[in-house]
């Protein structure tokens, strides 16, 4: 089981170079958790780039049985705030996690799972990265 960040979902949706590696990681994991906040952030980005029709495709993707949408509970809320204090945008830390990032981080942290992501921001935190992810 793994957690997916917005950046990983977008790489799959927009057929970015990491797409095949991310799809393989999702298939290996059998179950991929996604914060409901991550879903909102993903929809916002997709809508801004490609419009509402593309958002419908994202929703279809996330309805596949390999994905589980998880709303933040009290533990995730506390972990997201702690991540903001430690790694959040505007705090001078090189990770500079944004609001959406905080909830993917929190879900992975609370569940003790690795995070599937693209880019260097999470590499500057204490969260484990999915093995084999680019």
Predicted regions span which residues?
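Short, well-structured N-terminal submotif of metal-dependent ribonuclease cores
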Residues: 1-34, 47-60, 124, 133
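A general structural signal for well-ordered alpha-helical segments in protein cores
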Residues: 19, 39, 55, 77-81
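Glycine/charged-rich beta-loop-alpha catalytic/anionic-binding loops adjacent to active sites
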Residues: 24, 60-62, 85-91
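Short secondary-structure boundary segments
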Residues: 36-37, 73, 119-120
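Active-site neighborhoods of divalent-metal-dependent phosphate/nucleic-acid chemistry enzymes
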Residues: 68-114
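Acidic, PIN/NYN-like endoribonuclease modules and their adjacent C-terminal/linker elements
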Residues: 105-134
């Amino acid at each position: 089981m793994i957690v997916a960040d917005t950046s990983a979902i977008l790489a799959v949706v927009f057929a970015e170079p990491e797409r095949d590696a991310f799809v393989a990681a999702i298939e290996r994991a059998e179950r991929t958790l996604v914060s409901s906040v991550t879903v909102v952030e993903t929809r916002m980005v997709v809508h801004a780039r490609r419009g509402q029709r593309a958002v419908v495709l994202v929703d279809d993707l996330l309805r596949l049985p390999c994905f589980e949408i998880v709303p933040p509970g009290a533990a995730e809320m506390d972990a997201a705030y702690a991540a903001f204090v430690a790694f959040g945008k505007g705090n001078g830390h090189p990770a500079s996690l944004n609001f959406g990032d905080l909830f993917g981080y929190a879900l992975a942290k609370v569940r003790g799972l690795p995070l599937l992501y693209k880019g260097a921001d999470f590499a500057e935190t204490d969260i484990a990265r999915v093995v084999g992810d680019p």
